[in-house]
Amino acid sequence: MKLKTLTLTHYRNYETAELNFSDEVNIFIGINAQGKTNLLEAIYCLAMAKSHRTSNDKELIGWGHEFSHIEGMLSYKHGTMPLSLSISKKGKKAKVNYLEQKRLTEYIGHMNVVLFAPEDLNLVKGSPQIRRRFIDMEIGQISAVYLNDLSNYQRLLKQKNHLLKQMKLSNSNDMTMLEVINEQFAQYAVKLTLRRKMFIEQLETLAIPIHTGITKDKERLSLRYNASLNYELAEQEMFEETIRILNANMGKEIERTQSLYGPHRDDLSFKINDIDVQTYGSQGQQRTTALSIKLAEIELINQEIGEYPILLLDDVLSELDDDRQTHLLTTIQHKVQTFVTTTSVEGIEHETINKAKLFNVSEGQISTN
């Protein structure tokens, strides 16, 4: 898939902007704090209906305005599709083919993106919450069912935690309501855990040869989904085991006033040659691991939906050494539409620059060469 055009209205520091893109590489050039990353963020928002930089949607609305609007024309193998996202203080409205979607979960997945930014090193060395968010966002792009299950799970998790606090405050011994919530909670916990397990296995299969290529066969990468539930069981057995664990630990959860078991407690670990990369890996190994995961993600989305996603590279090409940059650019060449932000084209392969469409960004104004 390719993003042919992007139109912004009152988006961050852009009063208005209309851009036409190359199907190959598009590079936004400018000094810091001019709005380069805002453009990548707008593309990400158009795909995911949320920012990767802030959870406060009000920040996306230009100063002094009541709303912001992002619009894009997407092309696929079989045609084109207009997408739009309007953001106001009242909420968000998303349209596909000019038709408003009832839920954002119905909108997400029409446009697929993979973002690689300097902070993605935190995917390897950061908190488990970062890795869970990564898993949820990436599966959500290719599975509307997963997004729906995740939404239901998060709703039940919130209800359960609220009930646990009430039970501790009232010193209640009546477990009836908690048992009812646990049964519903377990159903979605099992669904999410099994889907995540499958995703991690698929990702590992694709990431291993990529990582081996980057490291010139010196290192072997492995991924493991560390779940609080036993995913080696059949689905029905797993559900029954989960119910047993939840009900056996009700007293403990009431005392702690939080849900101690379920996908919201899970993590993803990375090993190189059987050594934990998060704890013992060098920065170079952590960066290579993150790059391998991102490139594997591109291939996984293509396998699942039959289209390559759009790649967003936020100030990372200059941070990659020659070998990693070459591997990245070779992998995506002629297959993946790519958007790059950089303060300078120095350090980027000449071949890439020569075939790219360049956009100069300064104080919210954009010009092309």
UniProtKB/Swiss-Prot annotation:
Signal sequence, start to end: none
Keyword check for Nucleotide-binding: yes
Intracellular or extracellular location(s): Cytoplasm
CDD domains: ABC_RecF
Highest taxon of source: Bacteria
Record function comment: The RecF protein is involved in DNA metabolism; it is required for DNA replication and normal SOS inducibility. RecF binds preferentially to single-stranded, linear DNA. It also seems to bind ATP.
Name of the protein this chain belongs to: DNA replication and repair protein RecF
The species this protein was found in: Macrococcus caseolyticus (strain JCSC5402)
Phylogenetic placement of the source organism: Bacteria, Bacillati, Bacillota, Bacilli, Bacillales
Gene: recF
